[in-house]
């Protein structure tokens, strides 16, 4: 696993691909330091939002050389447990985001996201700009 790895969430990658300064600057720094980690879920979310063919090429270029975490059956089970635990506290996260949070927790990674609901996940390290 990448030392000091950072899972860069879909919300940030979308802004990066659009060239929005805050995301572009930080993601570029993380890429140059070889700290970016992603997951199949995040890749699927990016691909789902493609509007033009050239965007697919940009995503492929971005992801080349980036470590990709796989979501195993035990991780899905843990994501379900976390989702259930959060719901009992009145917090509902999309299951995809719960799985991303568990990936970060299980791999001792930081999550770079613009989605505020991740702050509700206990012990999740959020990347600070």
Per-region residue spans from a language model:
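Acidic, PIN/NYN-like endoribonuclease modules and their adjacent C-terminal/linker elements
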Residues: 1-3, 101, 105-129
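Short, well-structured N-terminal submotif of metal-dependent ribonuclease cores
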Residues: 1-38, 48-61
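Histidine- and aromatic-rich ligand-binding microenvironments
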Residues: 8-9, 39, 92-94, 115
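Generic structural signal for small/hydrophobic residues in well-ordered secondary structure
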Residues: 9-10, 46, 79, 104
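A generic structural signal for short hydrophobic patches within well-formed alpha-helices
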Residues: 13-14, 43-46, 76, 118-119
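A general structural signal for well-ordered alpha-helical segments in protein cores
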Residues: 23-24, 43, 56-59, 76-79, ...
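Active-site neighborhoods of divalent-metal-dependent phosphate/nucleic-acid chemistry enzymes
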Residues: 67-112
């Amino acid at each position: 696993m990448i030392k000091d790895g950072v899972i860069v969430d879909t919300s940030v990658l979308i802004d990066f691909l659009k060239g929005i300064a805050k995301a572009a600057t930080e993601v570029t720094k993380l890429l140059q330091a070889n700290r970016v980690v992603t997951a199949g879920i995040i890749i699927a979310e990016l691909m789902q939002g493609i509007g033009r063919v050239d965007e697919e090429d940009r995503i492929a270029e971005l992801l080349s050389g980036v470590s990709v975490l796989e979501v195993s059956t035990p991780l899905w089970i843990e994501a379900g447990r976390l989702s259930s635990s959060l719901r009992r506290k009145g917090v509902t996260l999309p299951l995809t985001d719960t799985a991303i949070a568990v990936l970060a927790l299980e791999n001792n990674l930081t999550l770079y996201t613009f989605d505020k609901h991740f702050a509700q996940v206990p012990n999740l390290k959020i990347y600070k700009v």
